[in-house]
């Protein structure tokens, strides 16, 4: 006899860094959200972007007149917001194309600024704090080496996450 085990994913996090692979991961997350939403009501889909402050070209430090590097950081925030808006647009389009009259996906955007270059940890910590049921992440991000099977961020998330992780290549 085989037992069927159904998993309820009511809160799904997708890590988005603007790379082609992260947008592909968004499509997978949206598809899962639609399927689970059809089975069990609405699903919250969280698009999360982590800005690694150590990767800014200019140093970011406090001065008497404000923060040096603030302009570059603001540009990164705008770029991150554009990525999240693109993912949200995909979710809305998919939700509208669904045959049901029910809006199954509630999309939420989050941007985290990471001061210590621990992007994987920032994703895992956020997922745990928000009680996420599933994390969807691309194999490699914008800076990943082509020959690596799994990037360092994805590897950290897979290793330390409290919940299931779907890695998309």
Walk through the language-model features, giving the residues of each:
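Structural beta-alpha unit
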Residues: 1-3, 7, 89-135
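A short acidic, glycine-rich active-site loop
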Residues: 66-82
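Gly/Ser-rich helix-loop-strand patches that form or flank binding pockets
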Residues: 1-4, 8, 126-169
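Short, solvent-exposed amphipathic alpha-helices that sit
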Residues: 28, 78-90, 122
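Small/aliphatic-rich secondary-structure junction motif
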Residues: 4-69, 98-100
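General small-molecule cofactor/ligand-binding pocket signal
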Residues: 46-48, 108-112, 166
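Active-site-adjacent beta-strand anchor residues
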Residues: 15-16, 112, 138
């Amino acid at each position: 006899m085989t037992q069927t085990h159904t998993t309820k994913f009511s809160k799904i996090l997708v890590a988005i860094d603007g790379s082609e692979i992260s947008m592909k991961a968004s499509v997978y997350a949206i598809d899962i959200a639609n399927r689970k939403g059809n089975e069990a009501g609405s699903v919250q889909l969280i698009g999360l972007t982590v800005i690694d402050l150590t990767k800014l070209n200019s140093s970011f430090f406090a001065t008497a007149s404000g923060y040096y590097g603030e302009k570059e950081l603001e540009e990164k925030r705008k770029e991150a917001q554009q990525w999240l808006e693109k993912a949200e647009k995909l979710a809305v389009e998919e939700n509208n194309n669904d045959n049901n009259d029910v809006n199954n996906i509630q999309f939420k955007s989050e941007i985290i600024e990471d001061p210590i270059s621990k992007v994987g940890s920032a994703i895992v910590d956020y997922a745990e704090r928000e009680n996420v049921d599933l994390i969807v992440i691309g194999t490699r991000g914008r800076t990943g080496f082509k020959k690596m099977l799994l990037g360092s961020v994805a590897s950290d998330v897979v290793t330390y996450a409290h919940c299931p992780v779907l890695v998309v290549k």
